[in-house]
Amino acid sequence: MQRTSGKITNFRDLDVWQKGIDIVKDTYRTTRGFPRQEVFGLSSQMRRSAVSIPSNIAEGFNRFHNKEYAHLLYVALGSCAELETQIEIASELAYMSAETKSSLLEKLDHEMRMLRNLVKKLN
C-alpha cells in the first residue's frame, strides 16, 4: 500500500492511515492467541479500538471542513489510547509476550505522533 506519487488523492495515500491498517493487522494476529473466554471480551475490544483508528482517519479525510477532520483525528487518538491501555491489560494477564507488547506500543506511539502532527497542520 505505498504511494506511487507524492500526491494525496484519498485517505489510502496517507501514511498515517496505512500505519493504522498495520496496527489493525498486528492486533488481529495478536488476539488470535488469546484465551477462548476473551473472544467477546478483551480480544473483541482491542480489535474494535484498532479498527477505529484508520476508520476515523478515513472518515475525517472525507469531511468538508478541517475542523471536522481534526475532530475525527482526535477520536482516532482516543482509540490509540484505548488500545494502549488494553495492550497493558493483556500483557498483565500474560496474554502476549514482552516482545509483542513492545512492538505494538512502539507502533502506537508512532501513530499517535503522526496523528498529532496532522492535527497541527489542520489547525
Model segments located where?
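Amphipathic alpha-helical assembly/interaction segments
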Residues: 1-123
